[in-house]
Structure formats: C-alpha cells, structure tokens
C-alpha cells in the first residue's frame, strides 16, 4: 500500500512505516497529479490522519496541479448509504421522428429527480448519422455517435438506434418506453456508487467555462468525464422527419470531455462557448461521472449548475438543482 492510499484510508500505522523507511521530506511525496498524502487525508475527511501528517512535517500549503492546497480539496468520502445514482443517457436526433417522445420522457425524469431530490442525472447525446439531405442536427457530433457505437461493441451487441436510452451503462431500452426506463432507473438506484465524484464551476472568462471535477479511489480501465448540458432549448425544424415541428429539448450535451484515470484525480475541464453549439446558453449545467472503459459501467456521478449570464457568480458548493 502506498503512503497516499494509506493516508486516504486513515491507516496511520502504514504511513508511519513509510516515514520510517524514507526519512526527511517523504511526508510530502507527490503523485503525478501533485497530490500529497495530506491532500488525500483531507479529501477523505481523515482528521486524525491529517493531524498526524501535519505533526510530521506535512506542507499545509502544498498545491496540486489544479492549484489546490489540501484544505481546498472537496470532501470525497463516499457515504454508501446515500450514494445510489442513475445516469440516464439518451441518444437522439432532431431528424428522428421517434425521438420527441423520448425527449419528453427524459425531461420528465429530470423534473422528477429535482422534485424528489434523487441522484438521477440526464444527458442527451445528439448523433450525426441522421444528418444530411434537408436537415442537419445543430447539436450532433460524430464523437457522440462513436460513444453509442462503443456501447454496441462493449455492452449491447447489435443494439444501435435512436431513440436509445442507456442507464448507468448497464441497461438499454427504447427511449420512449416509460415502464422500461423507470425499471432501469429503479434497479440502478438500489446499488450504491463505488466512487465519489465532485464537480463545480471554478471560473468564467471571455467565453470560456472552467469546471473542476474530482474523484478518488483505486481505478483500472476507467475515465472521468464531464458533459456540458443546456436545458429549455426550443428549435423550429425545417427539414428531415420532423419538418414543421418545434422541438423542446432538455439535457442537450453541448460539449463532452473525458480523461483516463490512473488513481485519484482532480482535473479541470475548459469549455469555450464560442466553439460549441447552443441556443441562448442559459440553463447550463455540468454532469460529471466516472465510467469503466472496458464494460461501460458507471461507478459514480454528480452535477452542478453553470452560471453564464452577466453578473452571475459560480456556486460555492456543487448542486444538482439546476434548471
């Protein structure tokens, strides 16, 4: 066990052994992300361990690659009793005539989650394989189509269509099948998360939004991802299967980024709103999650509101209550 793992687990005996073997400044040894043992102790709420490290020369002001001192690390201690979650992904297109009912169902799921304070997070990925001819989806992205194909390859053999709803990377159904959707969500909400995730907006300047997402745990074949989403979009469609209709859309993914995990990680994701599609860029949010890359199963998720309008300030604490 490394000194960082021991600090996160509160194992003072193991930490003491490391310090005896490596006298001097080993108490401040760093990971590739520049986390010290004290960062891990703070992130897990290990007060006794934190005091022990400080008594043995830990640097209280040591900064990781995000510029965070140990006291700046969000609490990443996982409360298994309250960590159940469901990440609902909808694969959709403005050019798909079967998709509007699925869009409405996903919006209903989000409203229910907010009203009941459930850890249900919704993201709608617009695929690009409907584009062409008389209409191209303004939110489509080839990367989103590739993500759906990854599910087909790694999890759901032969299952590749719109509207497709995928819950926690484990269950899939037609996106407008209400009973199937809620069955998958209820199954997911019976199982605790296995990692803690924190996400918050950290700055905003000149068309860019920065989101700090952190997670902690032992990872293999996993990635930390953040989706920038917008709610309350209305679009008049003038071509394709939905020609003549005005579509109302929530949870629309404007931009999506991932980093592979090799241990506890804090990462800053920057989104340039000048370069992403969008409506009025109001009602923005960020959904962060940790997902296995081998079988696509979700390990944990969280969300926060994104402030973009002039005069708005970032939330001090993460919140899933954005509209």
For each of these PLM feature ranges, what is it?
Residues 136-164, 168-323:
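Short, conserved sequence motifs used for protein processing/export or organelle targeting and
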Residues 5-11, 40-46, 73-76:
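Ankyrin repeat A-helix N-terminal signature
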Residues 11-20, 46-54:
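Ankyrin repeat structural motif
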Residues 100-114:
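Typically the conserved alpha-helix immediately C-terminal to a functionally engaged Cys/Sec
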Residues 117-145:
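Thiol-based oxidoreductase modules, predominantly thioredoxin-like and allied folds used
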